[in-house]
Curated annotation (Swiss-Prot):
Gene assigned in the entry: xseB
Catalytic activity line of the entry: Exonucleolytic cleavage in either 5'- to 3'- or 3'- to 5'-direction to yield nucleoside 5'-phosphates
Compartment list: Cytoplasm
Subunit relationships: Heterooligomer composed of large and small subunits.
Name of the protein: Exodeoxyribonuclease 7 small subunit
One GO term describing the cellular component: exodeoxyribonuclease VII complex
Lineage: Bacteria, Bacillati, Cyanobacteriota, Cyanophyceae, Synechococcales
Amino acid sequence: MSRRKREDPWRYEAAIAEVESLIAQIESGELDLAEVVERFQQAAQTLKRCAEFLEEKRQQVEILIEELNQDDEDWQAF
């Protein structure tokens, strides 16, 4: 039985590194206009995904803080 390799899950840090690489390619001056637009579009899409990820994580942190505050109130009731 062969094992399938798991695809690496999306990672914020890797996405930011990808955007930095795309920006470096754009700034190099070695691409033609069509390639510049393509790289710019890739960077914009990746940054949009990063923003969505950060918003999701912000909401998760807010929920955790609310739970901790509730737990603290419960302990103070004793």
